[in-house]
């Protein structure tokens, strides 16, 4: 009896996640550049902001040599579909403007992200999913509204209207 109830709960959660039609932003840890991948959901978007201030790993953007970050640094770079503005070394917030924010389009940008934990899982130069958790993505829509989503331990921030 209990097992069938658990299956129903798990299935319901999977259906809910699959039905999410909002915007999503995924963080991909990589070397030498970390990457953010955007999927525009049910509403047109004009820009996306990333706010690392609430992240479990006390994350920062490492954009210059000799600054706040560790070893490797990489400035913000368009990887397809965004206009990349400068980001100060050690900053915790960035904003990119979308070249084409129509429903269903994708965009990506890269930058180095480091954590500031003394006992981090993979060292301060690499970010794990648990360290990104709590960071915020703000999706700016074409009609001027903002939709906010919190990154989870899977490195995803999704708006499910």
Positions of PLM-derived features:
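Short beta-strand elements of extracellular/lumenal beta-sandwich folds
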Residues: 23-43, 53-55
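Sec-dependent signal peptide recognition
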Residues: 1-8
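N-terminal signal peptide c-region/cleavage motif recognized by signal peptidases
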Residues: 12-17
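Structured domain cores in non-transmembrane regions
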Residues: 43-110
